[in-house]
Amino acid sequence: MQREATLGRSVSVRGPGMHTGRVARVTIAPAPAGHGIRFAVPGAGPAVPATTVPWIASRMCTALALADGRKLRTIEHLMAALSASVIDNAAITVEGTEIPILDGSASRWCGLIDSAGRVVQERPREVLRIRAPFQVDGMHGFLRAEPAEAFAVDVSTDRLPGFGVLRWAGPIDPASFRTEIARSRSFGNASLIWRTLLKTRLARTLLPAGTRDRLWARSFDAQTVRGDGPEPTLAQPEHSRPIGPDTDARMHPRDREPLLRGARPGRVAILLGGRVLGGARFPDEPVRHKILDLVGDLALAGRPILGRIVANCPTHALTFAFLTELMRHPECWEVVTLAEAGPGNAATT
């Protein structure tokens, strides 16, 4: 029987947030079996679970509503690293209101988790097994869950100017996540990021004379290194279930909040047409980062998902809607515990 796991010791990291630009310190500590992943902000009330219940709409990130009315923003990269590392229980303390962006990827989070070690606990590990296809669409994309013997994804996007269709498919496990997904970085449009830097009066400090020209000279053309194989095609939607009006109402931010104040080279992959300024880590880095975000957002199901996720142009809000509506259709899923030998032997709980 597979069992839950937590960290072997506490680990901490400090850094600025992508959107607020403010420095926060995050400590990830071991937690008892059955605890789940919970976030606490000193002075903001009780810790909140990393589930769809406290999820609150926030532009360009995933956020949780704190008891004092504030938001804890940009949890998705840390959640992806915990999920892909098979960590079920952790007590996370955040001295601030946004998780540090670090280098824009989940690589450093994975390194911290690996350095802490993984401790198996006594409680059987439950997973949410997909029994029947389930799909929602909206916001120019769709998400679909299909029955499968392991967690896998098939994600495509065609909404990045100059990149054409980008698509990546494969299983997600601790090894594949680290080698194929974790290093992919958050990305943003060059003009939007330059404008933000200018507005915050940081451009002269961060981008001294000649820097922009050097970045252009080192630009990486994703189209030219994709290879001579066939051009990828978009994943295709099937029968979709409607998003309920109450779910739809929660998908849209209702307040103004800081955006991209901490974005700069070294923390984000800056896109210009079909190029990644300064070089890309993968030819299809943007869609791989879409998968990173998707893995983190799907972790808000509260249990690991056993199934294949097919998505086109997924967003944080659409993934929230997908999980919320999926929970309303229990005929499409079941909660099971899995034998150590693999997913083929399961018991319904």
Model regions: which residues?
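Short acidic-hydrophobic catalytic motif
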Residues: M1-T349
